[in-house]
Amino acid sequence: MEPADAPATASAVQAILNADILIFGPGSLYTSVIPNLLVTGIRDAVIKSEAVKIYICNVMTQPGETDGYGAFEHVQALIQQAGTQFLDYVIVNDQRVTAAQLAQYNEKGSMPVTPDIKKIERLGIQVIPTRLISNKDLVRHNPQKLAQVIISLVYRLRLFGKGIQFFDYFFMR
């Protein structure tokens, strides 16, 4: 990053500190998501913020960037960059890709990201596994499904607070 010590704007820091929810992703882990944590003032505000912090994990690996990564490795990379575990929730895809989709992506060196639910939960993070893939040819997040999961989580948090997991398994699938 240039400059390496780029300052965060006061308005960005204040927006993070005033936020109810901070959502990271989906997107390229090292070129879209992690860069948000490279600016020290932003990273510090994210860690200090009392907002619920949600990471939306990619559904496929990116050749040359996240080869062999499951959801756990994505989360580990975020935590390593932040210097501390800061996430409350991780939304992961648990839907299988079709054989045709898998063949198409194998040619490019891309594989489905494994959900790694238990490994992530051991970090103290609640995992929301759900069927997120679009029914089109490309393996992407279905925007309507993803929006539904996020909105359901927001309503659940408003109604019950951070600690209720019941909805995760019965109503968000």
Go through the PLM ranges and name each one.
Residues 1-3:
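Binuclear metal-dependent hydrolase catalytic cores centered on His/Asp/Glu-rich metal-binding motifs
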Residues 5, 9, 15-17, 29, ...:
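Conserved phosphate- and dinucleotide-binding cores of soluble alpha/beta proteins
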Residues 23-25, 54-56, 91:
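Structural motif
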Residues 26-30, 129:
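Generic secondary-structure boundary/loop-capping signal
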Residues 68-173:
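C-terminal functional extensions of proteins
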